[in-house]
């Protein structure tokens, strides 16, 4: 009972029995009471259970199906449908594999690490980041160009695991089911086809070092980063269930593929395929492990990245879509900023085409879009907060091409800023 019969009307907690005089707060419900201490205890229990669920990794029963994963990727990444399908299936199978590991089976399922091939700015990093967000797992990024094998100036491969551990708030269990994206992986290719007797500090040696953590090992991670030393305590992280996604532009790989598939005959009826016949992005879709071997990767490293996904180079149409369609589209972000100033921001179709063409000239893919917009919008974003009666700002192609000022529409008058 919530009211103790002790000759007084003193109320008590229905859970711990403490009276209202012994606690800070007593909250009443239908025929029951609960004190602030019991509420705090319940919160702690729920928080602990939530942490345990997160540590267990994504529940396969709640895990989005491949089609659902692709649908969410579509909201953030324009085009690249085939790559999205490959990623969705690989990620889904990866976490199904983790769930099956605790069950008796006569089949051993291999890890589905992924290799993403595609030009700069085609969406490789964004795809990996979005996957981690969908699955609610820790995510870390690393740049392969900074890595060297142990004992040389540079970053140890174990520091990649440290980044993931930090993303998981040093929860080792959660980190062990996270995703690591290694960018610029093509930069650690061997410098020549034949093994060298000299040390290849940032090439084959790094491949060998990465090989261990990608295939699964218990890594000793220095909690504060940096180089290892004997007096330092290490955190032990099992990388067996960490999904590794490696990405790179692989400049020159298209030539290797072209040499392999190109048919050359002499004399009449010669059937010669020109290198310009296919775009580099199309050629990359025909990549084989043998091509990667010739590019400079060791066979063991290629074998640990069994899933290949190719991203195509973005064209003008795709660039325009990227500007306005995704959930986090740049145009939507700028419009939201202006909306906070009670001003409508409009981009003409011509301005979107102009931004896209300027970005294509830079050959940095979608990465160039933001800097172009920042330069075009700087002055107007500086002025608008100080101006009154502004109703609308219109950005046309002249703002992009000729650095002209945007059109400002006031409450009753239209004039140039």
From Swiss-Prot:
One of its GO terms (biological process) is proteolysis involved in protein catabolic process. It comes from the Bacteria. Residues 1-54 form the ClpX-type ZB domain. InterPro entries: AAA+_ATPase, ATP-dep_Clp_protease_ClpX, ATPase_AAA_core, Clp_ATPase_C, Clp_protease_ATP-bd_su_ClpX, ClpX_bact, P-loop_NTPase, Znf_CppX_C4. GO terms for molecular function: ATP binding; ATP hydrolysis activity; ATP-dependent protein folding chaperone; protein dimerization activity; unfolded protein binding; zinc ion binding. SUPFAM superfamilies: Glucocorticoid receptor-like (DNA-binding domain), P-loop containing nucleoside triphosphate hydrolases. This is ATP-dependent Clp protease ATP-binding subunit ClpX. GO terms for cellular component: HslUV protease complex. Belongs to the ClpX chaperone family. The keyword ATP-binding applies. The keyword Coiled coil does not apply. ATP-dependent specificity component of the Clp protease. It directs the protease to specific substrates. Can perform chaperone functions in the absence of ClpP. Component of the ClpX-ClpP complex. Forms a hexameric ring that, in the presence of ATP, binds to fourteen ClpP subunits assembled into a disk-like structure with a central cavity, resembling the structure of eukaryotic proteasomes. Keywords: ATP-binding, Chaperone, Metal-binding, Nucleotide-binding, Zinc.
């Amino acid at each position: 009972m919530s009211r103790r019969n002790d000759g007084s009307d003193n109320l008590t907690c229905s859970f711990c029995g403490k009276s209202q005089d012994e606690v800070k707060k007593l909250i009443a419900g239908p025929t029951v009471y609960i004190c602030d201490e019991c509420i705090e205890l319940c919160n702690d229990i729920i928080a602990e259970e939530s942490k345990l669920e997160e540590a267990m990794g994504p529940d396969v029963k709640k895990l989005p199906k491949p089609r659902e994963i692709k649908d969410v990727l579509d909201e953030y990444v324009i085009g690249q449908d085939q790559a999205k399908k490959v990623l969705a299936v690989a990620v889904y199978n990866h976490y199904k594999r983790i769930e099956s590991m605790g069950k008796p089976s006569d089949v051993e399922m291999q890890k589905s690490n992924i290799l993403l091939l595609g030009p700069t700015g085609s969406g490789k990093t964004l795809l990996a980041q979005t996957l981690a967000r969908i699955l609610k797992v820790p995510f870390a990024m690393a740049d392969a160009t900074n890595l060297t094998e142990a004992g040389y100036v540079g970053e140890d491969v174990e520091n990649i695991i440290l980044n993931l551990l930090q993303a998981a708030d040093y929860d080792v269990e959660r980190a062990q089911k996270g995703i690591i994206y290694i960018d610029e992986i093509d930069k650690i290719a061997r410098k020549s086809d034949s093994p060298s007797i000299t040390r290849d500090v940032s090439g084959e040696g790094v491949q060998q070092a990465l090989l261990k953590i990608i295939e699964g090992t218990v890594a000793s991670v220095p909690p504060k980063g940096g180089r290892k030393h004997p007096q330092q305590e290490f955190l032990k992280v099992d990388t067996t269930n960490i999904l590794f996604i490696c990405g790179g532009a692989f400049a020159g790989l298209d030539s290797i593929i072209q040499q392999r598939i190109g048919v050359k005959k002499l004399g009449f009826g010669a059937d010669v395929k020109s290198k310009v016949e296919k775009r580099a992005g199309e050629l990359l879709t025909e990549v084989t492990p043998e091509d990667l071997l010739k590019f400079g990767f060791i066979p063991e490293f290629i074998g640990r990245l069994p899933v290949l996904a190719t991203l195509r180079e973005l064209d003008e149409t795709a660039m325009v879509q990227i500007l306005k369609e995704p959930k986090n589209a740049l145009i939507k972000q700028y419009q939201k900023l202006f909306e906070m100033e009670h001003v409508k921001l409009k981009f003409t179709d011509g301005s979107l085409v102009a931004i896209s063409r300027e970005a294509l000239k830079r050959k940095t893919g979608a990465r160039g879009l933001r800097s172009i917009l920042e330069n075009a919008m700087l002055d107007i974003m500086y002025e608008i907060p100080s101006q009154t009666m502004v109703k609308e700002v219109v950005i046309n192609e002249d703002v992009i091409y000729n650095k002209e000022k945007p059109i400002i529409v006031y409450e009753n008058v239209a004039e140039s800023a």
